C-alpha cells in the first residue's frame, strides 16, 4: 500500500541529511512513521515544505518529497501549493493520503485536489 503523508514539519532524519532546520515538536509523527515504514507492505512518502530546492529522496525506507518555500508556503500561495500537491500525487500514486492537520495550506489544498484517492485526516491537540 502506498501512503502519502502531508505534514507541517521537516523530520529530523531528513533535516540532518540536508543541513536544514527542524522542529522539536511532532515526536509522535516520527515514531509513527518509523513503525509504518517497517511494514514491508507499505511504501510511506512524506510531503512537506522547507527552505531549499525541490527534493525527492529516500532515507531509512521513507520517501520524502520536499517543496521549496518553507514556512511561507505553509501559510500562503494556495495556487502554487495546489500545484505542489498535484505533483506529489503524480510522483507517489498513493492508495491513501493521510493529512496530519489542516491548520496550514498544504493539508487544505490536498483535500481540494486529491480526487478519488481516499483521505484520512488527523486532527490532534483539541
Q: Where do the PLM segments sit?
A:
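Histidine-centered beta-alpha loop that forms part of the nucleotide-sugar donor binding/catalytic region
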Residues: 8, 69, 123-126
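A conditional alpha-helix N-cap/helix-loop micro-motif detector
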Residues: 25-26, 78-79, 100
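A short, charged, and often flexible helix/loop element on the N-terminal side
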Residues: 60-83
Amino acid at each position: 500500500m502506498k501512503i502519502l503523508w502531508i505534514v507541517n514539519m521537516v523530520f529530523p532524519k531528513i533535516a540532518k541529511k540536508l543541513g536544514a532546520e527542524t522542529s522539536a515538536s511532532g515526536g509522535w509523527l516520527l515514531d509513527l512513521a518509523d513503525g509504518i515504514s517497517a511494514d514491508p507492505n507499505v511504501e510511506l512518502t512524506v510531503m512537506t515544505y522547507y527552505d531549499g530546492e525541490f527534493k525527492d529522496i529516500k532515507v531509512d525506507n521513507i520517501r520524502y518529497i520536499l517543496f521549496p518555500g518553507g514556512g511561507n508556503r505553509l501559510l500562503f500561495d494556495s495556487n502554487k501549493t495546489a500545484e505542489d500537491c498535484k505533483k506529489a500525487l503524480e510522483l507517489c500514486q498513493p492508495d491513501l493520503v493521510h493529512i496530519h492537520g489542516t491548520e496550514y495550506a498544504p493539508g487544505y489544498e490536498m483535500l481540494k485536489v486529491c480526487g478519488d484517492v481516499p483521505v484520512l485526516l488527523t486532527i490532534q491537540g483539541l
